[in-house]
């Protein structure tokens, strides 16, 4: 048995060359036992790897959705921000335009330097121009000088308003559609501005050398005669006295204006049209102011009918010529005072 085993082992040990390499590979392959201590503890199982991969994919999807949402929000906010910025720019432009217009209007109407040349006049000059407005000029061969200021004419218009108010109150005038002050201001300023504009238009048609400012000054100083006539005749009511002052004082101021326009107009037809229109309007306006806002004060009849007659039964009438001329002003003033007292007591 030993002899049989020996060859067998010898055969195994002494195998042919074809088996030598295989045996060496088997012997050199090492042990089949796995050393668990040499394994890496950080390496996970396949299930753990799949979980991590799934979690990573979910995080990437969430990040992609968040990025898409942020992009959409950015686009929406960008459009909204653009519209808001555009509206703010439009509002800012409108505000700036309105501010510029308001500043221009304020600078135009509130700057006193613009109006200073029209009211920069000495009282002595105004007094001399008032006297000159009642003196007609004789030389009409060359254009006469016209004052280019508005202080004197404006003060004369306000004086006429005050005199007209006095005449309305003493004549017991009733204005149903407005106050006495509004009616007086509208009448005086309406005549001054309206007639000046109309005469300036006619002067332009007739080729007269006069400006609107000069026309306002000329007509304004022409109201000086009206103020004197109305102030006297509102306190002393005599038709003869009124017509005398109307022709004398009103005629002198009208002739002064006519002479100035004649000196600045070329052609007889143009002169007749322009000067005739101005003279007619100026003289008729004085008649209107006298007869439209004035009647005899009812208290004057106290000297004729007695103070016991009710005011509603009185009839306006002229003062008879029986009163002496020297006592007439005193009698009229006394009667006017009595009339005012009776009227106040009756109301």
Swiss-Prot record:
Lumenal side of membrane: 167-184, 235-237, 293-347
Listed transmembrane segments: 146-166, 185-205, 212-234, 238-260, 272-292
Gene Ontology biological-process entries: cell differentiation
GO cellular component terms listed in the entry, alphabetical order: Golgi apparatus; plasma membrane; transport vesicle
Disulfide bonds: none
Modified residues (N-acetylalanine): 2
Chief subcellular location: membrane
Membrane topology label: Multi-pass membrane protein
Glycosylation sites noted in the Swiss-Prot or TrEMBL record: 334
All ranges on the Cytoplasmic side of the membrane: 2-145, 206-211, 261-271
Family that this chain belongs to: Belongs to the YIP1 family.
Assembly and binders: Interacts with YIPF4 and YIPF5.
Protein name in the entry: Protein YIPF3
Originating gene: Yipf3
């Amino acid at each position: 048995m030993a002899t049989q085993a020996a060859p067998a082992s010898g055969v195994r040990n002494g195998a042919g060359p074809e088996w030598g390499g295989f045996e060496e590979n088997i012997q050199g392959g090492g042990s089949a036992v796995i050393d668990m201590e040499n394994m890496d503890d950080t390496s996970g199982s396949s299930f753990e790897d799949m979980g991590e991969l799934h979690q990573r994919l979910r995080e990437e999807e969430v990040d992609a959705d968040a990025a898409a949402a942020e992009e959409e929000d950015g686009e929406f906010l960008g459009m909204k921000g653009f519209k808001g910025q555009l509206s703010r720019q439009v509002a800012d432009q409108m505000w700036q335009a309105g501010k510029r217009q308001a500043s221009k209007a304020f600078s135009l109407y509130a700057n006193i330097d613009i109006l200073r040349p029209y009211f920069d006049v000495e009282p002595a000059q105004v007094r001399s121009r008032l006297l000159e407005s009642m003196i007609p000029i004789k030389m009409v061969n060359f254009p006469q000088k016209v004052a280019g200021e508005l202080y004197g004419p404006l003060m004369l218009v306000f004086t006429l308003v005050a005199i007209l108010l006095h005449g309305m109150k003493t004549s017991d005038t009733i204005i149903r559609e407005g106050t006495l002050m509004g009616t007086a201001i509208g009448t005086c300023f309406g005549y001054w501005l309206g007639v000046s504009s109309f005469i300036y238009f006619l002067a332009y048609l007739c080729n007269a050398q006069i400006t609107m400012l000069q026309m306002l000054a000329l007509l304004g100083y022409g109201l000086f005669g009206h103020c004197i006539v109305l102030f006297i005749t509102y306190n002393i009511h005599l038709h003869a006295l009124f017509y005398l002052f109307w022709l004398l004082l009103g005629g002198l101021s009208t002739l002064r204006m006519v002479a100035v326009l004649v000196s600045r107009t070329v052609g007889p037809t143009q002169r007749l049209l322009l000067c005739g229109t101005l003279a007619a309007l100026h003289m008729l306006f004085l008649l209107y102011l006298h007869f439209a806002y004035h009647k005899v004060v009812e208290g004057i009849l106290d000297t004729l009918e007695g103070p016991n007659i009710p005011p509603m039964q009185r009839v306006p009438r002229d003062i008879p010529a029986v009163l002496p001329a020297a006592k007439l002003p005193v009698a009229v003033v006394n009667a006017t005072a009595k009339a005012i007292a009776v009227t106040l007591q009756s109301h």
